[in-house]
Amino acid sequence: MTLEKGNIIKRIKKNERDEFSNTVANSELTYKVIRVNTKTYGLECIGGYMKGTKCNLIKGFKEKSADVYGTVTEWILV
């Protein structure tokens, strides 16, 4: 997925295990792309528990991935 300045994307995390039911392993964050560099995208969180924070996302990010605990993370373009 290639992003441009002004795009809105969502990061959706899901984990079906009971011990993760009330944690950030089951969360949804909405970001706005505020900067595009040669290697990263600059993001500002505009919705969710991290609203108002900024971060960088590497350009080669995986649109869908899973970790060792079974949490599936998916990035979607809104």
For each predicted feature, which ranges?
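Short intrinsically disordered terminal tails
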Residues: M1-E4, I76-V78
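Disordered, low-complexity tails and leader-like regions
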Residues: T2, G6, N26, G47-G48, ...
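Short coil-to-beta transition motif at edge beta-strands of beta-rich domains
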Residues: T2-T23
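Ordered hydrophobic segments in well-structured contexts
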Residues: N7-K10, T30-I34, G42, E74-I76
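Assembly/interface hotspot detector across virion components, adhesins/toxins, and nucleic-acid enzymes
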Residues: I12, V33, F61-S65
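Intrinsic disorder/low-complexity segments
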Residues: K13-K14, K39, E63, L77
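Basic/aromatic-rich interaction segments and small domains that mediate binding to polyanionic partners
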Residues: D18-K59
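Intrinsically disordered, low-complexity, charged/polar segments
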Residues: I46-V78
